[in-house]
UniProtKB/Swiss-Prot annotation:
It comes from Xenopus laevis. Identified in the spliceosome B complex. Component of the U4/U6-U5 tri-snRNP complex. Component of some MLL1/MLL complex. Interacts with the snRNP via the Nop domain. The coiled coil domain is formed by two non-contiguous helices. InterPro entries: Nop_C (IPR042239), Nop_dom (IPR002687), Nop_dom_sf (IPR036070), NOSIC (IPR012976), Prp31 (IPR027105), Prp31_C (IPR019175). This is U4/U6 small nuclear ribonucleoprotein Prp31. Residues 84-119, 180-214 form a coiled coil. The lineage of its organism: Eukaryota, Metazoa, Chordata, Craniata, Vertebrata. Residues 1-24, 333-356 are annotated as: Disordered. Residues 7-24 have a biased composition (Acidic residues). GO terms for cellular component: Cajal body; MLL1 complex; nuclear speck; nucleus; precatalytic spliceosome; spliceosomal tri-snRNP complex; U2-type precatalytic spliceosome; U4 snRNP.
């Protein structure tokens, strides 16, 4: 295989991996497309000319069927075989689809009322952004804006702070009075919107009551309303059980936003599961992570429900408990950093800076006086070997002529060896008794000698007993026991005395 073929093969593998992470085009059909602009005829005489759902045959038939099934309470034993085969299941799916159409119809009616009522109170649109709250407020105020003050019905619709802002703005608005015909059209649109909203809530209640029999495990995890919505978009419980978890998470996603609403709050690839109560109960930074986890568990629960394996919902409770445990684990504070004690220092061999052995070593290895003199130099004096006449290091003060005296080594009195007084007396007695010097004998041996240096004779060996012998010979003349009397003659008298 050539190098080009290997590169092409690598690119193909990378493309296959990207395709696995992407969503199939068939699955993209489940994402709802919302028109960027609602085509509303502002010149329409009545709201019924643009909002035709409430008068449609499908709307009335579904509501009649729902009323009939509400009166009959199903039993768990009656749910057999595929869920799609049950006649009531089709009504549930149609009711789910009808709620989506009701939402779109409410948006159309809201835009119709907003455009018509802007003639009277144009600032109300920015003060009350919610569609249903806006419709209820318009119905309550009508053509008389003074109703904002001390209105108990309005307090049930808006908060006190919003009512205060609306009342202040209403007193300074530049709007014009509506005619009776315009006011009648607006009130008719408001009544239709409120009726549609009431029908939507009734459908939700019915679907939620039936989801405990159709998909009990799925309803336990995400709630009956969300379970009914994702089942309706997926095309049934069987189709939902065949979908992967990554596509289940996208069910109910919207591609575009409605006209007049900000697009910054719209999150891409977020469906009904993302907006469910179990996911929205967490902090915002965990929403996507939680939606992935919940969609995976919903896939497992839908597969269990499609085969009616656990109608009492035990598996659903187990899965929800596992989800809640993971949610709690995610929200746990980080563990407290353990305060570790300092490690024991590595005590190596310390340098001994005192003691008898250290002093002896320092004396043995210390600098001698000769070395100190060789290392010492005088400032401002030229050295003898400054011109490199001699090889080697300079001798410093040692190489200079001095007085000729040799400085005696200083004795350190602190380290000087001492003997006790008792030992001194003992040594003195021994020297007197055993080795003491007297007129008869001496301690020194006869062969003892000393070496002396004299400037005249150089090296001279001296007998230390020579001086003593001279003294003894002189004393023998006068103090000898053999000495005789001497005769002294006087020259004058000529006599001799003895």
């Amino acid at each position: 295989m050539s190098l080009a073929d290997e590169l092409l093969a690598d690119l193909e593998e990378a493309a296959e991996e990207e395709e696995e992470n992407l969503i199939d085009e068939d699955d993209l059909e489940t994402i709802e497309e919302v028109d960027e602009e609602m085509q509303v005829d502002l010149n329409a005489e009545s709201v019924k000319s643009i909002a035709k759902l409430s008068d449609s045959k499908l709307f009335s038939e579904i509501l009649l069927k729902i009323e009939g099934y509400i009166q009959k309470q199903p039993k768990a034993s009656e749910v057999m075989g595929p869920v799609e085969a049950a006649p009531e299941y089709k009504v549930i799916v149609d009711a789910n689809n009808l709620t989506v159409e009701i939402e779109n119809e409410l948006n159309i009616i809201h835009k119709f009322i907003r455009d018509k009522y802007s003639k009277r109170f144009p600032e109300l649109e920015s003060l009350v952004p919610n569609a249903l709250d806006y419709i209820r407020t318009v119905k309550e105020l009508g053509n008389n804006l003074d109703k904002c003050k001390n209105n108990e019905n309005l307090q049930q619709i808006l908060t006190n702070a919003t009512i205060m802002v609306v009342s202040v703005t209403a007193s300074t608005t530049q709007g014009q009075q509506l005619t009776d015909e315009e006011l009648e059209r607006i009130e008719e649109a408001c009544d239709m919107a409120l009726e549609l909203n009431q029908s939507k809530h009734r459908i939700y209640e019915y679907v939620e009551s039936r989801m405990s029999f159709i998909a009990p495990n799925l309803s336990i995890i995400v709630g009956a309303s969300t379970a009914a919505k994702i089942m309706g978009i997926a095309g049934g419980l069987t189709n939902l059980s065949k979908m992967p978890a990554c596509n289940v998470m996208l069910l109910g996603a919207q591609r575009k936003t409605l006209t007049g609403f900000s697009s910054t709050s719209v999150l891409p690839h977020t469906g009904y599961i993302y907006h469910s109560e179990i996911v929205q109960s967490l902090p915002s930074d965990l929403h996507r992570k939680a939606a992935r986890l919940v969609s995976a568990k919903c896939t497992l629960a839908s597969r269990v429900d499609s085969f009616h394996e656990n109608p009492e919902g035990k598996i659903g409770y187990d899965l929800k408990e596992e989800i809640e445990r993971k949610f709690d684990k995610w929200q746990e504070p980080p563990p407290v950093k353990q305060v570790k004690p300092l490690p024991a220092p590595l005590d190596g061999q310390r340098k001994k800076r005192g003691g008898r052995r250290y002093r002896k070593m320092k004396e043995r290895l210390g600098l001698t006086e000769i070395r100190k003199q060789a290392n010492r130099m005088s400032f401002g004096e030229i050295e003898e070997d400054a011109y490199q006449e001699d090889l080697g290091f300079s001798l410093g003060h040692l190489g200079k002529s001095g007085s000729g005296r040799i400085r005696q080594a200083q004795v350190n009195e602190a380290t000087k060896a001492r003997i006790s007084k008792t030992l001194q007396r003992t040594l003195q007695k021994q020297s007197v008794v055993y080795g003491g010097k007297s007129t008869v004998r001496d301690r020194s041996s006869g062969t003892a000698s000393s070496v002396a240096f004299t400037p005249l004779q150089g090296l001279e060996i001296v007998n230390p007993q020579a001086a003593e012998k001279k003294v003894a010979e002189a004393n023998q003349k006068y103090f000898s026991s053999m000495a005789e009397f001497l005769k002294v003659k006087s020259e004058k008298s000529g006599t001799m005395t003895q």
